[in-house]
A protein has these predicted regions:
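Accessory RNA 3′-end/elbow-binding domains used by RNA modification enzymes
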Residues: 1-9, 13, 17-34, 38, ...
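A short, terminal or domain-edge coil/loop segment
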Residues: 88-91, 126, 169-173, 242-256
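A short local loop/turn or secondary-structure capping micro-motif enriched for an aromatic residue
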Residues: 137, 169, 277-280
Length: 288
């Protein structure tokens, strides 16, 4: 049975669910999840959790993400990226200095109105389904945090590359759209590559075709406790081990805080929280 994490470099034109479905078939494991959707046009870091490791998705999904994005000024589309239909073209008077000046307003805590072409739901229907039917509904602004935002380079007339580090739930194409609006010329996203997610970088990512061609695909999985490497480790046995496996708090001499908890044979049991000499389970990962 396959259990663990594989960081995929998602290819263009694949949906995140396409990638998960392919991995599900290759590894013969129905429990497969990912830590953050990438649009089909996007490429880059996509951590995929397999088997018992899917229990870690909720932690990974909350993490910051980093992107390299293409920004095209002077063009507005219905999807806020270059895959959509052009709805407006405007002259661009802004130069790189103007762009860099405009970015200041988008750093820190901001609000975004989610795009109609998104998987968010309204009355049980996904927004993109309504958009394709020619309907537009009101969307409430949502708070997001832009931790870093900078111009990397100018790649052509009115075209730039941006580096974006942001919180969960940020729409980079909406960011591009809003930056263009702030400059008075409109804009859209022309490319997107995720360079970091859930603490994993492009250097750790495996091309999807490498997984599909591997003689032993399961060998490419890293253990789920690798995701929690920042936490200290403690080993339990005897009565404490039995209580841990029953989901009960157990005595522990560890300092207060969160810990990786292992059995005497090195099996990763759970992520726990120690307080006042007692360890309680945050999330268990052992085989039942």
């Amino acid at each position: 049975m396959a259990n663990g994490i594989i960081v995929i470099d998602k290819p263009q034109e694949w949906t995140s669910m396409d990638v998960c479905a392919k991995i599900r078939g290759v590894l013969h494991e129905r429990r497969v999840g990912h830590a953050g959707t990438l649009d089909p046009m996007a490429t880059g870091v996509m951590p995929v959790f397999v088997g018992r490791a899917t229990r870690a998705v909720e932690f990974a999904s909350e993490s910051e993400k980093e992107y390299i994005a293409g920004l095209k000024l002077g063009v507005v589309t219905n999807t806020q990226d270059t895959t959509g239909q052009v709805v407006e073209e405007r002259p661009v008077e802004a130069d790189r200095a103007d762009l860099e000046g405009a970015l200041a307003a988008f750093r820190g805590e901001i609000t975004q109105i989610p795009p109609m072409y998104s998987a968010l739901k309204r009355d049980g229907k996904k927004l993109y389904e309504l958009a394709r039917a020619g309907k537009e509904v009101e969307r409430a602004p949502r708070p997001v945090t832009i931790h870093a935002l900078e111009v990397v380079e100018q790649t052509g007339p009115n075209c730039y590359t941006l580096r974006v580090r942001c919180s969960k739930g940020t729409y980079v194409r909406t960011l591009c759209h809003d930056i263009g609006a702030a400059l008075g010329c409109g804009g859209c996203m022309s490319a997107l590559r995720r360079t970091e997610a859930a603490g994993f970088s492009l250097a750790e990512a495996v091309p999807l075709e490498a997984l599909l061609d591997a003689p032993d695909p399961a060998a490419l999985l890293r253990p789920v406790d690798a995701y929690f490497f920042r936490y200290p480790a403690v080993t339990v046995e005897g009565t404490a081990l039995r209580k841990a496996k029953n989901g009960n708090p157990f005595p522990c001499s560890a300092a207060d805080g969160d810990w990786r908890v292992y059995g005497p044979g090195g099996e990763f049991l759970l992520l726990g929280r120690c307080a006042g000499g007692m360890m309680s389970t945050i999330k268990s990962f052992f085989e039942v």
